[in-house]
UniProtKB/Swiss-Prot annotation:
The keyword Transferase applies. This is DNA polymerase. It comes from Guinea pig cytomegalovirus (strain 22122). It holds the Pfam family DNA_pol_B_exo1. Belongs to the DNA polymerase type-B family. It catalyses: DNA(n) + a 2'-deoxyribonucleoside 5'-triphosphate = DNA(n+1) + diphosphate. The lineage of its organism: Viruses, Duplodnaviria, Heunggongvirae, Peploviricota, Herviviricetes.
Length: 1117
């Protein structure tokens, strides 16, 4: 029997469906006759959805109209159709803005270039702004009642500044000449105007306007951008070249990019609409006003989705291959923004779409409780149905897990490359919309949270939870299963990657199993979204910096600070230079700042950190400076109180206290008529000197921004403490966090040489002043706090232990100092720590610099720079930094073993006393007397760990190591790495491969018999799932070496100082173990030896000595 050429699920869905039959509904809008087009498309459908269990695909080009089936009803698929499970959307009618203003909340903005011949019905009074063309800003948002809004704002020009020595008339001719020589511009219409203006440069202290400065204005942003770049390449000095119309509008008019706005004068469109929103209006830039008093949200629509694919072969699905089809898409629709009390007033239609589940599937599918199941005859119809649903539901936020790199990319490539469909028609704009993904060529992301991959969907903000989890979590891997277990204590459905195709092809019930799996993934992402609340955090940053929410998600830290400085400088009649050339040694950093671009598709490098610069300084372009100070620690185990003091907001307070700024920097050697009292001068060890004018001469823009934000944060936290509404509390908390993070990012903004406005003098001054402050605290503590008179100012005699006072700094790191407080009771240090910190602050510093008391350790293991572990007074958990317990690479078993050892040292008095005693011994003492009895517990714990590893008693899941895949496998110069070998093995077995940015898990297995003892790790690395499935033995020796190495690194301070090879010390003190197979048991047993049966049929013999140090290690397998 030949296969059918067109698939209808209701012709092969069982007797019940044939009895019930199915009707056909033309779901297209309007009641008139529909036009029967002859457009053909390719139908691709798995044979298994027709013939249960069969493999392969059926392909046919058909001219039948696309369709879907829902509840035994057939629907014809049209872009404008009303979706059967969503309420019908009706365009709201509003007046012309004269009777009642329109108040709406905006969350997304784009700029469009509109021409005079546009089909849009533009109000006659605004048409002058688009003749011959003009920038139109489209603001998307929602009203209080949940109606979607598109506000078309007219009249925003594009402009930049440039210096030109010739006459004003000649400049027009020169600009015209440049434009004629600019590629792709000669056929575009625009208007151009150049006017002489008087502005100051932000860079460097100056009292004179920039000479020969012109403001170049165009009504076409793409042309404006190209012209500015061309002028820069010709050597002209250009200012603010990359600031787009949206940034101009928000900054110049003080309009929030995420917040409430009011429009008192507008025109409501009734036809010639540009969007699919419920309300669409036109207005001018002067008609939009900010309503900053209200920080609440309306109810925004969200959608969490996931896709399932099936490869035509035995490889991982590739979207460019016709046979690698999408078989299912799940969507969870829900709302965010309002609290329960606030949402009571939401309309019934809006409430109906608040939360529900949808599944789009190929072929017939058994019902899934609580889920709308849509069945499609082919992949194209499934994809078309999903995009039509996306357009009908019109989500404001789209989320998923790893959707930037996989799901969205896969769907777009299938629609565009395989089926040649235009996906931009499914955005919120009727024309001119974009639905695209941007992956820069040749740019290797440092990690999965990199902003190098950008997704643009007009009117919808895409928020991938995968990079959010990577940025906020330290985990061995970042699979959805791991994150769900960590944050939600939930798990994915138990269905492996290999089981999906046969289960899907089995029958209707099998497709329901895969459907539930797909829905569960989307549901877990939705719960992660609500658990982490990153959307509130990103929205707070967008509100603060006046940049679109999508820029917060995709553009990193630099653009946020740039926008804030742009606004503040504008209020002082200052402008920001733009540069294309790379920084040259010895030049002011401002001479090399790259173009500050607000473009969606800009390839600029942006800093994604919180603003920290390494102590090595910059290495880009030959410019460097010494970074933050880290003092050499006094290594050791301290069983006396150790107080930790740190500076509150160190770098921001330095900027404010010393008036550091681009605008206050004074190039030395320039005669500005300033006295010595007017200048703050810094001189470095190499003779370099930097000067900044003091506050009475000119106030620092950076300092005023920081002071305002820190004061705002203080007031927000005060309101937060009194707030009762949970949603409002969350918004306020994220806002104060945004203020804190943005303040801390200023140093990184000035210090990152590849950033938008690096300035070596500012960054070097900040770190130098920070070092001086740290050293002044160290000197003060060591000079004055070692005397009883100092402590008796705050303490009584009963607060001292009676032992000799031993107070000194044992470690200093950037903004923190660790002070040993020997002879003082721990509780007393805690009680009076703030008072002591205040005393030091008053003695050494002036506001706003402040030293604070952070915590006190009961005991502390200081290992080396950046590495320590200790027990904080009053807490039951250890505080640690830099050791394997907080690293992603270590396996869980090593972590648990080290944690057990540390807990014994810090929480068991006899072990702690033994550790102190051991640290005071020499190797001769150990050989003569053995290790202290308190240390026997650690020896026993390590011996037990060795037994568990050698006898294969450890769960393989606890032995999983991992490494990050930072680039494509082929790009690695060194191929003999464990995680790369695992990927090669996965590829050979045609299994699912990790993506760039993922952490690749692996297990070290036992080598083949006869292999070298020192077999490289890459030769014995294997995928954990494969190890478990095939019950492969692990390499106990390798893992125990890792345990011993890690414990040695942590316990280094208590190992006798004269031990020549500390890594061998534990091998000296551990009892001997010999592991033999069971057949040798009668020959291996001695009278005084302990024999234990092994799980694998072997036995373990152990020899214990009274002095364990005398027993060496001898192991045979």
């Amino acid at each position: 029997m030949s296969a059918p050429v067109f698939f209808n699920p209701y012709l092969c869905g069982g007797a019940a469906r044939r009895r019930n039959g199915c009707s056909t509904v033309d779901s297209r809008r309007g009641n008139g006759p529909t036009k029967k087009g002859k457009k053909s498309f390719l139908q691709v459908v798995p044979r298994g959805v027709i013939y249960d269990g069969e493999k392969g695909l059926i392909k046919k080009v058909t001219q039948h109209p696309p369709r879907m089936f829902y509840n035994n009803v057939q629907y014809l698929l049209e872009p404008q159709m009303s979706w059967p499970t969503l309420p019908c959307r009706e365009t709201c009618r509003v007046g012309c803005g004269r009777e009642q203003p329109l108040r709406f909340h905006t969350f997304d903005q784009i700029d469009s270039t509109v021409y005079a011949d546009s089909v849009e019905q533009i109000f006659l009074g605004y048409r002058r702004h688009v003749v011959p063309c003009g920038n139109v800003i489209r603001m998307f948002g929602r009203t209080c009642d949940g109606s979607s809004v598109c506000v078309n704002v007219f009249g925003q020009p594009s402009y930049f500044y440039c210096e030109y020595d010739g006459s004003e008339g000649y400049l027009d001719n020169y600009l015209s000449t440049v434009l004629k020589e600019t590629e792709d511009v000669t056929k575009i219409v625009f208007t151009l105007d150049a006017q002489r203006v008087h502005k100051y440069s932000l860079f460097g202290y100056n009292t004179k306007y920039i000479e020969n400065l012109y403001r170049v204005t165009l009504n076409n942003w793409p042309v404006c951008k190209r012209l500015a770049q061309n002028l820069q390449s010709r050597g002209l000095r250009v200012y603010e070249a990359g600031v787009d119309p949206v940034a101009r509008f928000c900054v110049d008019r003080k309009i929030p990019s995420f917040g409430w706005c009011v429009i008192k004068r507008f025109y409501a469109r009734s036809s010639g609409l540009a969007s699919f929103c419920d309300i669409e209006i036109d207005c001018e830039i002067g008609d939009v006003e900010a309503d900053d008093s209200d920080m609440s949200w309306p109810e925004y629509r969200c959608a969490s989705f996931d896709i399932e694919c099936m490869s035509g072969g035995d490889r991982f699905p590739d979207s460019s291959m016709v046979d690698d089809i999408v078989i299912q898409i799940s969507v969870i629709c829900y709302a965010v923004g309002r609290s329960g009390a606030e949402s009571d007033g939401v309309s019934g239609a809006e409430a109906a779409v608040r939360e529900h589940q949808h599944l789009f599937t190929l072929g017939p599918c058994a019902p899934i409780p609580g889920t709308h199941v849509y069945e499609f005859p082919s992949e194209y119809e499934l994809l078309l149905g999903f995009f039509i649903f996306f357009k009908a539901y019109s989500p404001d936020i789209l989320t998923g897990y790893n959707i930037n790199l996989f799901d969205i990319k896969y769907l777009l490539q299938r629609m565009e490359k395989i089926y040649h469909a235009n996906v931009s028609e499914f955005t919120k704009l009727r024309f001119g919309g974009r639905f695209s993904i941007y992956v820069p060529v040749g740019n290797k992301p440092r990690n999965a949270s990199s902003a190098s991959i950008k997704v643009h969907c007009t009117g919808t903000v895409v928020l991938d939870m995968y990079p959010v989890c990577v940025a906020k979590t330290s985990a061995p891997n970042y699979k959805l299963e791991t994150m769900a277990e960590m944050y939600l204590n939930e798990h994915k459905d138990d269905l492996s990657y290999k089981e999906i195709p046969p289960t899907f092809l089995a029958n209707d019930n099998g497709r329901a199993v895969v459907g539930r799996y797909c829905i569960k993934d989307a549901l877990l992402v939705k719960r992660l979204f609500e658990k982490l609340n990153y959307h509130y955090e990103a929205a707070s940053v967008a509100r603060l910096a006046r940049i679109p929410l999508r820029s917060v998600i995709f553009e990193g830290q630099q653009i946020r600070i740039y926008s804030c400085i742009l606004e503040e400088a504008g209020e002082r009649n200052m402008i920001l230079p733009s540069f294309l050339t790379a920084k040259r040694p010895g030049e002011l950093a401002t001479e090399s700042s790259p173009v500050a671009s607000f473009e969606e598709d800009s390839e600029q490098t942006s800093d994604s950190s919180l603003g920290e610069v390494s102590s090595q300084g910059s290495s880009d372009g030959g410019v460097g400076y010494q970074g933050a100070t880290v003092l050499e620690p006094d290594v050791g185990f301290y069983d006396t109180p150790v107080a930790v003091f740190d500076f509150a907001s160190l770098y921001p307070s330095i900027i404010m206290r010393h008036n550091l700024c681009y605008s206050t920097y004074l190039p030395l050697g320039r005669d500005d008529g300033l006295s010595d009292d007017d200048v703050f001068l810094l001189e470095f060890d190499d003779g370099t000197r930097y000067g900044f004018v003091r506050e009475h001469v000119r106030k620092s823009i950076l300092g005023e921004l920081l002071a305002r934000w820190l004061a705002k944060r203080k007031s927000v936290r005060k309101v937060l403490a009194e707030c009762q509404d949970e949603v409002e509390k969350l918004i306020l908390d994220k806002y104060q966090l945004a203020l804190k993070v943005t303040c801390n990012a200023f140093y990184g903004f000035t210090g990152v040489s590849s950033g938008m406005m690096p300035c070596l003098p500012i960054a070097a001054a900040i770190t130098r002043i920070g070092r001086d402050m740290l050293m002044s605290v160290v000197d003060y503590v060591n000079t004055y706090m070692g005397h009883a008179e100092f402590w008796l100012r705050y303490l009584g005699e009963e607060d001292l232990t009676g032992d000799a006072l031993n107070v000194k700094v044992i470690y200093g790191d950037t903004d923190s100092v660790f002070v040993i407080c020997g002879g003082v009771k721990c509780g007393s240090v805690l009680e009076h720590g703030e008072a002591i910190a205040g005393h030091i602050t008053r003695a050494l510093f002036r506001e706003p610099i402040k030293l604070e008391f952070e915590k006190v350790f009961v005991n502390l293991m200081m290992i080396c720079k950046k590495r320590y572990v200790g027990r904080i007074y009053g807490q039951t958990k250890l505080s640690m930094k830099g050791i394997e317990l907080v690293r992603k690479t270590a396996c869980e078993y090593v972590k648990s073993t080290v944690r057990n050892v540390l807990n014994m040292i810090f929480f068991e008095d006899d072990v702690s006393a033994g550790a102190v005693e051991l640290s005071r011994m020499t190797m001769d003492d150990v050989k003569r007397h053995g290790v202290p009895s308190g240390f026997y517990r650690i020896v026993e714990a390590l011996s037990n760990a060795r037994d568990e590893l050698y006898l294969n008693r450890v769960d393989v899941k606890k032995l999983v190591l991992s490494a990050s895949l930072s680039q494509e496998v082929s790009a690695y110069k060194q191929q003999n790495l464990p995680h790369l070998r695992v990927i090669q093995r996965l590829a050979a077995r045609r299994e699912e491969l990790p993506s760039v940015g993922d952490r690749v898990p692996y297990v070290l297995i036992a080598p083949p018999p006869g292999s070298s003892k020192n077999v490289p790790n890459y030769e014995i690395s294997e995928d954990p799932g494969y190890v478990i499935e095939h019950k492969l033995p692990v390499n106990g020796e390798k893992y125990f070496e890792h345990v011993v190495k890690t414990v040695t690194n942590v316990l280094g301070p208590i190992i006798p100082k004269d031990c020549a090879r500390k890594e061998k010390f534990l091998s000296y003190v551990l009892p001997q173990r010999v592991y033999v197979s069971r057949p040798f048991m009668p020959y291996a047993c001695a009278a005084n030896e302990l024999v234990v049966a092994c799980d694998d049929g072997g036995v373990m013999m152990g020899v214990y000595g009274i002095k364990p140090v005398m027993c060496g290690v001898s192991v045979t397998n």
